[in-house]
Amino acid sequence: MRADNLLFSPDGQSVALIDWQGCCIAPPVFDFAYFLIQSMTIEDRQRLEDNLLRFYAEELERGGLKISLPNLREVYESSLIYSFAIACSIPLINDPSIPRVRELAIAMGTRSIQVLKDHGQI
C-alpha cells in the first residue's frame, strides 16, 4: 500500500483506498497477493503469509464465498508473477532518475523476486 493511494476525509475519521494501476479481469486473490507482497517487508511476509492466507479464506467464507485453503493457495501462487510484472513496469511508466521512483522499483522488484523464490517459481 502506498500513501499516494489513500484518500483521507477532511476530519481524518475515514480513509479510502484507490489504485487504477493494474485494471484487469483476474481472480480477487491477485489483489490480495499484490497487497501482501508489496506492502510488507520480505521478512514479515514470510512470517505471516500462511496465517494471512488462512484469515483471508475465513473472511471470504464469512462473506459468502467458500474456497478451500488448498485452492486459495493454488490461485495465490499462480498470481505471484503478476506482482513481478507490475514491479517491472515501474521504471517504464515513471522517470527512474527520480530517487523515489528508483527506490520503489528496487523495493517492489526485490519483494517480487523473493516471493517467487520462496514458492519455488524461480
Question: Predicted segment positions?
Answer:
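Regulatory N- and C-terminal appendages and interdomain linkers associated
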Residues: 13, 70-122
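Short, glycine- and charge-enriched coil/turn segments that flank and shape catalytic ligand pockets
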Residues: 11-12, 62, 66
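Active-site activation/catalytic loop segments of kinase-like enzymes and analogous catalytic loops
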Residues: 25-64, 80-100
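A short glycine-rich, hydrophobically flanked beta-strand micro-motif that places a catalytic Asp/Glu
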Residues: 6, 67-72
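Active-site acidic catalytic loop and adjacent metal/ATP-binding pocket
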Residues: 1-28
